[in-house]
């Protein structure tokens, strides 16, 4: 397995400070020991409409010059709107992101079935408002209708991606997708070799060993990409996970997740993303230096888990049935 850095971490949204140019992000990724960079296909970094072919070739050369790879381009698709024109617009953007992935030499595009988006409040990112907007925006639309719209769009997009040699990696990210079972069901219903799974541990419905391991087993060879997040500290010369401030969840069970991935034979990327408000002890918004510290610790933390995974431990016994909701 390899460890990547997702460029959204330095997009200027989640901390008090400016976005870093991609050239600086590439340099940081190399200096901090990452193997590759996942490039977010939106401003300020890589919106396809801002990049002509020359700019794309330059970006590809800059990554290669650092000895890095581009394992994926990250899209932000929402195929669950009841408004036909909005779904068509989302397809148009996603198809341009497919072409961007091709031009950057990335093998895949990360996609969502649906996405609430973010807003900038006083210049900084938050999820609060879009969660409320999503809940109240289409009160007469059913989840099943949204599911069918997403499947329809993903089928069209998968056909397009396949023609360009790109694999779509469907993330187990809400809304519409509620858990890894939904993700796998949608991949099965789309029924295209160009649509596979991006299973992320923080998004699993439960974090106990048995659930995490079974989720990885359920996904199996359909797993082509993954992300990890969180915050870290240094203790006793090692990077250790700590709870995210102001978040209503505990630690993520990355140890069981990585062990299970290793035993399933996964050889792809785990890409770190810092995509939540960077807060200090008094809930003040911290700056770029703290994000850099977290990015460095995150790489060390995942390397520790990969080293441990090279010495397999006994995982929970396989279940006869797939994990159920």
Q: Language-model features: where?
A:
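Short, small-residue-enriched loops and turns at beta-alpha junctions
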Residues: 45-47, 77-81, 116-118, 174-177, ...
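Conserved beta-strand positions in the central sheet of alpha/beta enzyme cores
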Residues: 38, 72-74, 110, 169, ...
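Short glycine-centered, acidic/aromatic-flanked micro-motifs in structured strand/loop junctions
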Residues: 41, 170-173, 201
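Active-site acidic/histidine proton-transfer and metal-coordination neighborhood
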Residues: 23-27, 61-69, 81-196, 316
């Amino acid at each position: 397995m390899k460890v990547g850095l997702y460029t959204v971490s330095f997009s200027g949204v989640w901390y008090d400070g400016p976005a870093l140019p991609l050239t600086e992000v590439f340099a940081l990724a190399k200096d901090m020991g990452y193997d590759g960079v996942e490039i977010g296909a939106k401003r300020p970094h890589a919106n396809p409409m801002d990049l002509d072919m020359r700019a794309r070739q330059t970006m590809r050369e800059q990554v290669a010059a650092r000895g890095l790879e581009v394992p994926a381009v990250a899209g932000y698709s929402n195929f669950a709107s009841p408004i036909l024109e909005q779904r068509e617009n989302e397809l148009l953007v996603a198809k341009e992101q497919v072409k961007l992935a091709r031009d950057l030499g990335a093998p895949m595009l990360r996609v969502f079935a649906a996405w609430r988006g973010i807003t900038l409040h006083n210049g900084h990112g938050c999820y609060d408002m879009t969660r409320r907007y999503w809940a109240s925006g289409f009160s007469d639309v059913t989840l099943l209708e949204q599911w069918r719209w997403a499947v329809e769009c993903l089928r069209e997009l998968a056909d397009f991606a396949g023609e360009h040699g790109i694999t779509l990696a469907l993330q187990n990210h809400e809304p519409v997708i509620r858990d890894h079972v939904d993700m796998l069901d949608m991949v099965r219903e789309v029924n295209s070799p160009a649509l596979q799974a991006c299973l992320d541990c923080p998004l699993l419905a439960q974090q106990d060993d048995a659930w995490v391991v079974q989720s990885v087993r359920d996904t199996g060879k359909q797993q082509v990409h993954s992300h990890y997040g969180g915050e870290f500290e240094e203790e006793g010369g090692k990077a250790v996970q700590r709870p995210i401030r102001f978040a209503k969840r505990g630690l993520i069970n990355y140890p069981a997740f990585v062990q299970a991935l290793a035993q399933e034979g996964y050889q792809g990327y785990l890409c770190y993303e810092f995509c939540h408000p960077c807060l200090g002890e008094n809930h003040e918004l911290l700056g770029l230096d703290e994000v850099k510290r977290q990015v460095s610790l995150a790489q060390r933390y995942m390397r520790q888990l990969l080293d441990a995974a090279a010495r397999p431990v006994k995982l929970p016994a396989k279940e006869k049935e797939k994990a159920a909701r």
